[in-house]
């Protein structure tokens, strides 16, 4: 049985009759204070809401045919669950973005156990990554799929963190350019090299792979330099897709982000280093897509909030329901802030200040002759 704790001294209370509204009173045996604790239904309602959100249940099967459920849980759709500031240093973090529609992307950062941060943007760019990463302490290693603007943000926010590009994304990018059945010798050899990239386990194997890639570039340099006329009469590279694959691999080899997971000093510091982004792709993004698929038909705003709720529940130390309702912003509070800013802009726009008012002499001319019709 759950005990009632005294709010004054923290000791266990005993039953002490009932008040006029027939609510149970409780007496503390130590400090003799009497209190009537209120039943907190918000926690129960939030648990019901989250249980529905994270399951395959539909609202029609909820009590009251869904109407009672929607009425009791509508308040939770108004909340924007924002990420906390992470001051604890982590050895490895994973970052990625998930697109919810054409102009809505949620950037997510996690470690092996929890979601550390999330940020809503229209598309992946440097400022969005900076906003996400600036709330998290710099880790020893970050694994990413090479999203747009991430390298710039990494240099600015986490300048000392080492970067490992997800090898599976690198392989997938090459496969997209060469296809799984290349029709040229150069394409077949490059595709075979890309497949081997996923199975390198030592530094010597990685160095050998780089040498073979450089040999491939020298061997097919003349073939890749071929140019031809397109339908508009312009000269273009004949094997443009192969050139894109070659340039992407060359850039990664030059940056030194392909084989960070084989760095012996880093392994000695943090242990085994991951080479792929599977932790966030399979552990978080896949579950978020399943959530949105189970509740398909949600508006874009509710899709975003559903992702925010999932990330918040899986964050390291989520707040209690009472604290969450007090701290987290809502649609109403955000609208009030924008309205206040809008009213301030209107006030400064329409109230004349020094140098803004109309000067009478600029619109009227004075002379020695009398002018009675002005």
Regions found by a protein language model. Name each.
Residues 145-148, 152-194:
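Conserved beta-strand -> loop -> alpha-helix junction used to position metal-binding or nucleic-acid-contacting
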Residues 23, 27, 33-34, 64-160:
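RNase H-like nuclease fold core
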Residues 25, 30-32, 36-48, 141-147, ...:
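Acidic/histidine-rich catalytic cores and adjacent linkers
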Residues 1-5:
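A broadly conserved sequence feature marking short terminus-proximal activation segments
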